[in-house]
């Protein structure tokens, strides 16, 4: 399990909390960001992470890249499903 609470940064600085829990991995992060009114080339272009939960004891920073976290969660999910052999392969891949 990997969840992050994404928050619209612009609205937050205006005093309004607009956000939602996002389960990772997610197939369409862009649509999820649009659902909290975060869009490229608009008044509200940025989101940040205000809370998180995961089974991996991974500390998530406020401004971590949501797309990178999504990729990480895909790998962690794969490792969890496939077992330690997959973990070895992922570590070997990271070293190269």
Locate the predicted segments by residue.
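Structured domain cores in non-transmembrane regions
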Residues: 28-96
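N-terminal ordered "arm"
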Residues: 1-41
């Amino acid at each position: 399990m990997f969840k992050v609470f994404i928050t619209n940064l612009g609205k937050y600085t205006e005093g309004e909390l607009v956000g939602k829990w996002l389960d990772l991995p997610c197939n369409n992060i862009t649509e999820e960001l649009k659902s909290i009114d975060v869009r490229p080339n608009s008044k509200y272009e940025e989101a940040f992470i205000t809370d998180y939960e995961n089974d991996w004891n991974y500390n998530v920073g406020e401004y971590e890249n949501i797309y990178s976290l999504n990729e990480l969660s895909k790998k962690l999910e794969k490792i969890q499903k496939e077992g330690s052999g997959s973990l070895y392969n992922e570590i070997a891949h990271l070293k190269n």
